Amino acid sequence: MLTFIGLGLYDERSITVEGREALRSADRVFAEFYTSRLVGADVDDLEAYHDTEIEVRAREGVEQDPEAILAAAEDGHTAFLTAGDTMISTTHTDLRLRAEERGIDTRVIHGVTAQSAASSLTGLQNYRFGKATTLPFPYAHGGDDVPGSVIDTIEANRERGLHTVVYLDIKVGTGPTGPDPDHEEYMTADVAAGLLADGWEDALAVVVARAGSPDAVVAADRLSALADREFGDPLHLLVIPGDLHHVEADALVGLAGAPAELVEE
């Protein structure tokens, strides 16, 4: 049996009760934290809180050599953990398909995701979001600007009146000069806003910082203004709103501090 368990957004307590029970009853527990991280807890915190040993795998190991996970699932109850929800990444869908092909029963226990939290915290309606995109560090894509794919996604959504979630790059184990096991870097919202402001400086944007934590921050303003502010510890993301329903506009003013004249434009 292979159970995929989403850990939620922030720390060892963000998991659902159902997920916690499945985790504690597993014979072996694997985890992958490349796709996203729990910035409020490390592996030691998770192991202590859930009274279990966790075997962390690199993303490449999950994608290219998942045999240890699959073999464990054939022999007993195995749990596979990620931050957020495990099925957001195609890497984990592939692992589930491999398990099913080998006759291994699978189960998914969902966790809260950054996208659902972004909608909840900002007051932007869930069904008015379009395709999401990820903004990489400039060195990660070999340029010094915003990739065309990111611009195309935002513009396509805006043309349809839809909001865009912009996930911000995470680099763990790889830095500007190549592989580095000690490298851990998170793009912050001010850096992202600065990159996107080159061409959209007056565009409305919303920062969501540390969703799921006790000190989550939501702030809305022009991209150029957000680029000059600091939002504290990661994880951060940006939302580029499309057309606003009047309730959404009120929410951005009341919950995120957006200038009233900006949401009326």
UniProtKB/Swiss-Prot annotation:
It comes from Halorubrum lacusprofundi (strain ATCC 49239 / DSM 5036 / JCM 8891 / ACAM 34). This is Diphthine synthase. Its EC number is 2.1.1.98. Keywords: Methyltransferase, S-adenosyl-L-methionine, Transferase. The gene is dphB. Homodimer. It comes from the Archaea. One of its GO terms (biological process) is methylation. It is an enzyme of class 2 (transferase).
